[in-house]
Amino acid sequence: MEKADLLVIGAGPYAYAAAAFAEQSGIDVRIVGRPMAFWREQMPAGMFLRSGSDWHLDAAGEHTFEAYFEDRGLSRADLDPIPIAVFLDYTEWFRERKALRVEDRLLSGLAKADGTFVATMEDGSTIVADKVLAAPGIRHFANLPTWYEAVPSGRRAHTSELVSFEELTGARVVVVGGRQSAYEWAALLCDHGAERVDV
């Protein structure tokens, strides 16, 4: 049985930020999850972050985007808005600078016992933690309308499922939604040669 003061469940940007802050505060941290998996696997290559480079993951203000740009020899002016590839590189740079140890494994169960938490991993191992911080990300929270299932499979996709647009070259596409991901995916569909895109 493994132990930790704080178990961070998830390995995305907010998990990294919280774990770094906790470690900086002297807390023994374990991070479990697939490192930046949603961002690497569910985001299209041409996507830009809605946020500019004036924010960062570091509560201490040390490993900021500015520090990353300087270290990489990049210009802030050339990278605003921030491309997804640059964001992924920043998160890896941040993780390395903060020496965050991410265990690439998934949780299968969590129970409370005797004032602690017992996390069971998919491989059957357990971690006992005094505190747990859940940072599962948005992958599991796709909002699908009730009529979604009525549209034949292969003719519908949530934005989190559609990361390659080549198959829609020349197609007519309806994007249902009115927030950032709807407009971003509409623009990406146009960039990849969709005949028509209606939002």
Indicate residue ranges for each PLM-predicted region.
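Core beta-strand elements of the Rossmann-like FAD/NAD(P) dinucleotide-binding domain
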Residues: 2-4, 122-131
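N-terminal Rossmann-like FAD-binding beta1-loop-alpha1 element of flavoenzymes
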Residues: 2-31, 174-192
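Phosphate-coordination loops involved in phosphoryl transfer and adenosine-cofactor binding
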Residues: 3-5, 104, 169-171
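Glycine-rich active-site loop/strand segments that organize a redox cofactor
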Residues: 32-86, 199
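Glycine-rich dinucleotide-binding loop and its adjacent helix/turn
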Residues: 83, 136-193
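Helical element adjacent to the flavin cofactor pocket in flavoenzyme catalytic cores
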Residues: 85-102, 139-142
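A conserved short coil-to-beta-strand element within the FAD-binding core of flavoproteins
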Residues: 103-116
